[in-house]
């Protein structure tokens, strides 16, 4: 069983997406004309700015710009024996005394969607840049392609780098440690989060 870990409610601090440490190089595919956006560093040291509520979560999410967790969360996963974890420390520019340390998580695990079992079809595929469109915007339930899984516990989901997919071992560790600002969805609701559950 796989799970998607997501952020929690708005009472927590959140990542200011306007002041991100990642930028993009953009170009157009000469075959189909679609925009190709390649992430790049915009600063030597990854920096973030926090806004919002008074509480600091263990999960910060910046959409396609990356997944940011507290260092404590990563340590909890590692102590549980989780595999597939790589990360870079992040500097909080408006750091306060109680601000925890944060890291930019780079999942080394991989698993993809079973498009056929999820009744999703790719259309208008471009052989040059690899981009395509889906025939369904909200497929449900989503099925995982188990043959695509590389066996690691902390994964990215196919073409969706903002989706943090984990095994039961990681979810159990998060629950035991009572990590803050985290919710999760079970396998069938991965990607579309129709039924978020609090950790």
Feature roles, as predicted:
Residues 1-199:
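Phosphate/anion-contacting hairpin/loop surfaces
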């Amino acid at each position: 069983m796989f799970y998607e870990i997501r952020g929690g409610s708005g009472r927590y601090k959140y990542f200011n997406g306007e002041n991100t440490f990642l930028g993009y190089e953009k170009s157009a595919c000469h075959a189909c004309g679609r925009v190709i956006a390649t992430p790049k560093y915009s600063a030597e040291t990854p920096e973030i700015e926090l806004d919002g509520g008074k509480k600091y979560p263990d999960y910060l999410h910046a959409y396609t710009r990356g997944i940011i967790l507290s260092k404590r969360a990563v340590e909890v996963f590692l102590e549980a024996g989780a595999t597939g974890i790589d990360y870079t420390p992040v500097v909080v520019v408006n750091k306060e005394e109680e601000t925890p340390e944060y890291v930019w998580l780079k999942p080394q695990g991989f698993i993809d969607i079973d498009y056929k079992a999820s009744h999703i079809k790719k259309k208008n595929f471009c052989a040059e840049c690899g981009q395509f469109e889906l025939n369904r915007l909200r497929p449900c339930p989503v099925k995982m392609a188990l043959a695509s899984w590389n066996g690691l516990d902390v994964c990215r989901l196919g073409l969706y780098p903002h989706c943090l997919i984990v095994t039961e071992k990681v979810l159990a560790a998060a629950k035991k440690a009572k990590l803050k600002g985290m919710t999760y969805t079970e396998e069938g609701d991965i990607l579309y989060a129709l039924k978020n559950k609090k950790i």
